[in-house]
A protein has these predicted regions:
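Short, polar loop motifs at secondary-structure junctions
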Residues: 31-35, 121-122, 187-193
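Active-site segment flanking the S-adenosylmethionine/decSAM binding pocket
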Residues: 135-170
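Short, glycine/acidic-enriched loop or turn micro-motifs at the edges of active sites
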Residues: 31, 53, 143, 157, ...
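Long, positively charged, glycine-interspersed low-complexity recognition regions
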Residues: 165-266
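Active-site regions of enzymes building and remodeling cell-envelope glycoconjugates
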Residues: 43-49, 148-151, 194-207
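Class I S-adenosyl-L-methionine-dependent methyltransferase module
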Residues: 42-142
Length: 266
């Protein structure tokens, strides 16, 4: 379903890269709508935590077989008034039926191309078998107390629209924490401090820009001191992300068109 800052469009290539590592336990401290963790090998021990309690409650309900209803505008108003994070319907209405997946944004039921309420419901039903064994926890990344071989962080992006209760997110504190982790760690963000290496980027086709007028670009960062620990046979997959060769030329042409329009991307 729609979730501001979600990784649904890039979840499979990101998960494919992580799954090629020799680790067997995985943690997402900002699991969000669980797009990436759902694509990770089910044989791995997978942990997903988040400070957005309503999403954790929703994911826990979905993994046990709960099927969300179609949220009407009237139902959404009632859910918003109650705003009960322990009701799994709350997150469906709060994000899945909101404009662009923003927390309690304008109600979005359907357009000429898509029924958003139905899409949210169907997406969650399809998600259920993929997250059945995931251990979800409502917690801040600092206090989660979870240990894993590989950590993937998708924190709220700096200087972009906030998600849920994360508008006061301390970015400096996060990077300090990430730089001290002994586990392999990867981060998606617009930029990173010294000591981090960008290994991939993609211009997101979202139909709107960041607050500063720039296009949103997804970037994956790895710690420079940890590079030797990543699978060194994956240089090609890091560069072109294991894409079907037939798609590479199309992507290169699209990327060239974007760069000609907005300037060379970093």
């Amino acid at each position: 379903m729609m979730y501001l800052g979600g990784k649904a469009t890039v979840a499979k290539p990101i998960a494919r890269f992580f799954a090629a590592q020799t680790t067997r336990s995985y943690w997402e401290p900002f699991v969000g709508a669980a797009s990436v963790i759902a694509e990770m090998p089910p044989s791995w021990i997978r942990y997903g935590s988040d400070l957005e309690q309503s999403m954790i409650i929703l994911l826990q309900a979905v993994q046990t077989g709960w099927k969300p209803p179609l949220v009407t505008e009237r139902m959404r108003c009632q859910l918003r008034e109650k705003n009960d994070p322990l009701d799994p319907c709350t997150a469906v209405a709060k994000f899945g039926c909101s404009f662009r997946g923003c927390a309690w944004g304008g109600y979005t039921y359907k357009s000429a191309k898509q029924n958003f309420a139905l899409t949210a419901r169907n997406t969650l039903i399809k998600l259920a078998p993929k997250i059945r064994d995931v251990i979800f926890k409502f917690s801040d990344y600092l206090t989660a107390g979870i240990s894993a071989d590989l950590i993937y962080c998708d924190p709220p992006y700096k200087d972009t629209y906030s998600v849920g209760c994360k508008s006061d997110f301390n970015h400096a504190q996060f990077w300090e924490w990430a730089s001290k982790q002994e586990s392999l760690i990867a981060v998606t963000e617009r930029s990173a401090p010294a000591g981090w290496v960008k290994v991939w980027y993609k211009v997101k086709n979202q139909g709107f820009k960041n607050r500063d007028g720039t296009y949103l670009v997804e970037r994956l960062w790895l710690r420079e001191d940890q590079l030797p620990r990543w699978n060194r046979d994956l240089k090609t997959s890091v560069r072109c992300w294991n894409l079907n060769p037939l798609l590479v030329d199309r992507i290169r042409k699209k990327r060239a068109m974007v760069e000609n329009r907005i300037g060379a991307l970093p």
